[in-house]
């Protein structure tokens, strides 16, 4: 009984440590942008994400199972706050660019990206190109 309780405490502590490590890695690894996505009723939610530039566009990446990803697929117009400026964009899923975008994310965010790759299948993430809608 004591062994089971100790094992449970160890597992729960390890999970908590992993969650905290991923949060710290995601927030401290470099630039974090704020994206406001909207539902069909116009209500917005803000999500903090990593961003990279590739060619003439900014890219985000996400998992199709995440809530913010589902919102931007249904309502692709978003607002992105980056470097103190807010701009409007249309989100365009760009699966064909998974490899170069993942490489850029890894270069830019280093250890933080590696930690996240441990718990996520990076073959599932979808790069999202941001097309400017103007001011």
Predicted feature locations:
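Terminal leader/tail segments of proteins
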Residues: 15, 24-32, 36, 129-132
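Short helix-to-loop capping/linker segments positioned immediately adjacent to catalytic or ligand/cofactor-binding
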Residues: 21-24, 37, 115-117
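Hydrophobic membrane-insertion alpha-helices, especially the h-region
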Residues: 5-23
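Short, structured beta-strand-loop surface elements
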Residues: 44, 67-134
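Short beta-strand segments
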Residues: 30-64, 78-82, 88-92
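Short linear motifs in intrinsically disordered
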Residues: 21-27, 66-72
